[in-house]
């Protein structure tokens, strides 16, 4: 130990050297007044090396830990020609067991390369979901494959409710026994209907029913008289209209192109009444009707 009661004086240089040699701990504290920081742990570079080493070990560990199952014949594997792999049963079942599914990062990196080890002949036909249809979704979500099957079922139901697509191709209408009607009978029936519609209370019609639908409506109106004594309508042909009858009686030549029309009266009575009726119709056309007070001579 160093004692302060030495006889050496502090003023000499030699005495200072002797004192420093006797007390080495005192020199560390007085070495420029700096304190050395103690070491607290590994540095950043060492920590980075340790992290990279652990990551490299974790990537190589699944290939050594998980051994492939034995190739013993299980009841789920069916007899097939060629090599049979144990994964084919899981593909057909639609799900993998939990021990065969690798961790998430490894599965994301290696799922493309792992497909090359499986033969294409043992793979079943993939549906619309592709490879990911065999992975079970979480409990809070539903698989997209279920949505596809529901959509197909709804299409079948809707197509069953709409049978007209198939009726156009397969259904044939049943044709019953048809009756043929001669053309002459149709014409006489249409004449009867026209006469019934156009016969007035006085027994006269407005104009010739044969020329009702004809486009040449410029000809003057003619009269047809109904004979109530006859049970069935008997048509008599008249040679000319009112103007041609007047021309014949006056001695002038009438044209040869005759337009026939029909009447219910015999020929003798028809000629007598045509003379009186032709003048009366001309005058009535321009007279006023006293019942309604309408002047027919006014033209719009």
Curated annotation (Swiss-Prot):
A motif (EAR) lies at residues 294-300. Residues 1-45 are annotated as: Disordered. Residues 1-10 have a biased composition (Polar residues). This is Protein SPEAR4. Interacts with SPL and SPEAR2. Expressed in leaves. The gene is SPEAR4. Residues 25-39 have a biased composition (Basic residues). Keywords: Repressor, Transcription, Transcription regulation. One of its GO terms (biological process) is leaf development. One of its GO terms (molecular function) is DNA-binding transcription factor activity. The keyword Ribonucleoprotein does not apply. Adapter-like transcriptional repressor recruiting TPL/TPR coepressors to inhibit TCP transcription factors. May be involved in leaf development. The keyword Cell inner membrane does not apply. A motif (SPL) lies at residues 40-48.
